[in-house]
Structure formats: structure tokens, C-alpha cells
Amino acid sequence: MARRNSPEAIAARHAFRASYWNWRSFRAKQLPSLTLTSDPSLNRSIQSVTLEDGSDKFVHRNQLSVDAGLEIQQNIALTGGRVLLKTGLERLDMFTDNISSYKSTPVVVGYEQDLFGFNDLKWERRIEPIKYEEAKKTYIETLELVAAYTTNRFFNLATAQTSLEIANYNFAYADTLYRYAQGRYNIGTITENEMLQLELNKLTEQTNRLNAQIEVDDYIQSLRSYLGISENITLVVIPDDSIPHFTVDVNEAMQLAFQNNPDISAFERRRLQSESNVAEAKANRGFKAALYAQFGLTQSNEKLKESYRDPMDQQLVTLGIRIPILDWGVGKGRVKVAKSNRDKVYTELEQERMDFELNVAKIVKQFNIQAGKVAIAYKTDQTAQRRNDV
């Protein structure tokens, strides 16, 4: 019930759901995308045009342009580029001259690439799977922690119920002694001061009983709320007296911890993110260039069918460059900062990994002695019972 209804479990489900859709979005970026584009426009205006003799003249334009195109794009993670394949058709209607014409682009192949730039797709392919694996392990860990929290609330209530039983017994015992004291006082065998002391003991035990009952009610409310039980019911927990006899091997526990604990995935993610920041700082510091190349076929005609006959080839190549000449050390400083942060992360991860191993060993050691501690407590309880009977 707690794994389904507790606040921690509900929050963990929402967090994992968000991580899942982030993972789906990352996977979708690796797949081809298909896009339909269309930009119809109506132009009724007076515009200036340049004639063959170089003079300008205002002419009235009354035209409608309607186009549609299909485009497939695919990201290339290895290079960080993008390849595209598209086709389209455009119709132009000149209402003034009552002329219609078509322009077709049966096929166009293009490629876009940042040269010497930061390849975020490559780093995402390394980091995102680890982030998703970390999210899955975190969700499982949270559910296990919910079980542990529920167990703690269970035994808190069990302890409070035992304390209430002891408080009831102590009150009954103190009340009995006080009644006997009243009888003895009436016959003059004890002093008034002795009787008043026993009455004070009774009142103290009565207060202890009230406090124990309040504590039980509080723990019932805490457990009921954590389990998602809205009904106002009384819970009575019955702990099991049997103790499983087994020990945990330190090496096996260490191996399972490295396999299943989300902290290990977080260590690797943080390391890769620090290296990614260094690579990005280096790429943004120096020479940058962007290449775009497009090759395809195109044709135009006043008839739709004829616009697809004997298409002509078309090419478009653009190259943009950016060369920092003087930045007063800004780029170099950013690289130094990124490297310093990376080295800091390395140091932190080394220490946290060592602490992780020591913590696992400590928890295993503490767990393995629990059975012995419970056995000693049980023996102590039996001895106290025998002493009380005597």
C-alpha cells in the first residue's frame, strides 16, 4: 500500500515519468523526422521595380502564391550534422495578367554541418542512456526506501503499543497499592505521608498512561496517512517474533551495490558532463565554420504536368566562418574554468566513491550484528520476566 499511496512513491512515479519522456525525446532525435510545410501568401500592393534601362517604376501587384513541401531530416550523431531530403511544388497566380505558373522541385538533397564546433549529439548519446539508467535505479531505490520507512512506522507503533500496555500495568499496580494504603491508613498502620506518596505515584502513572495513549494515536495516524488510508480506523500491529538467521557477504553486497545503486550511475554522468563542458568550451573558443550544401532538380512551366518534364539541376553551397581575432582571453578563461571544474568533479567523485564503499561495508556490518542484538534483548526480557515472577 505504501509503495502505491505514500507521498514519496507518488513523487517518485512522477519523477520517473518525466525522465522516461526525456529519454523518449532523446531517442526520437535519433530517428528521421517528416515535416509538411506550406506558406501561402496573397500580395495586392503597389511596389517599385527596376526596369531594363535602370529606372524604377511603381507597378500594381495582384498575385497569389501557394506552395507545399515534404521534408525528411535525419541527425547524424557521429558528426553532429543533419541530412535532409525534400520535395515541393509552388503555384503562382498573377490575377492582373490572368496567368498561372508552377515551379516544381521533385527532389532536393541537402547536408548541414558545423565544422570544428561542439557536437552535442555525440555527447547526448553518451550521457542520456546513463541518465535514464540512473532514473530507473532511483525509482527502484525510492520504492525500497518507502518499504523501509513503512517498516519504521510499523515498529514505532508496535513500540508505542507495548509502552501503553506497560503504562496500563503500572497504573493498575499503583492504583492497587493506593487502595491498600487507604485501608491501612484507616486502621493506623501507615502514616498519612506514606499514603499521600502512594497517591502521588498513582497520579504519575495515570499521566504516563495518558501520554502513552496519545503516542499510540499519533503513530496510528502517521502510519495510516503514509499508507493512504483515509478511513478513521484503529490499527493494531502484531510484530513477528521470529528472526531470520542469515548474514550478508560484504563482497556480494558491494557488487550488488555497484550494479543497482543510482549513485554509481550519477558518478559516471557527472564525469561525462564535466568532460562535455570542457569540449564545449574548447569548441566555442577557436575557429568555427558552418557548411550547407544542397543539390536537386527543379523546373517551372505554366502547366502542372510540364513543370515536371526535363527538370534542371540546381546547387547551393554556403560556407560561413567565424575567426576570433581578439577576445582578451575570454575563450581561454572559459576553457580554464571548465577544466578546473572537471578536475574538481574528478576529486569529488573519487572521495564519494570511497565513502560509498565504506558506507556499504559499515551497513553490512551493522546488519549482521542485528540478530545477535535481538537475541540479547530477548534474553534480557526473559530474565526480567523471571525476576518479576519471583
Where are these regions (language model features)?
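Bacterial Sec-pathway N-terminal export signals of envelope proteins
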Residues: 1-67, 114-116, 120-123, 127-129, ...
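A glycine-/polar-enriched beta->alpha junction
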Residues: 4-8, 17-33, 69-101, 109-127, ...
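Amphipathic alpha-helical coiled-coil segments
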Residues: 11-26, 142, 146-168, 178, ...
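Small/polar, glycine/serine/threonine/aspartate-rich low-complexity segments that form flexible
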Residues: 38-109, 237-247, 279, 292-323
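Generic alpha-helical secondary structure signal
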Residues: 106, 176, 248-252, 316, ...
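Periplasmic alpha-helical coiled-coil/stalk elements that build and connect Gram-negative outer-membrane
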Residues: 126-256, 366, 370
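Active-site lining segments that contact anionic ligands and/or coordinate catalytic metals
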Residues: 286-290, 314-316, 362-364, 371
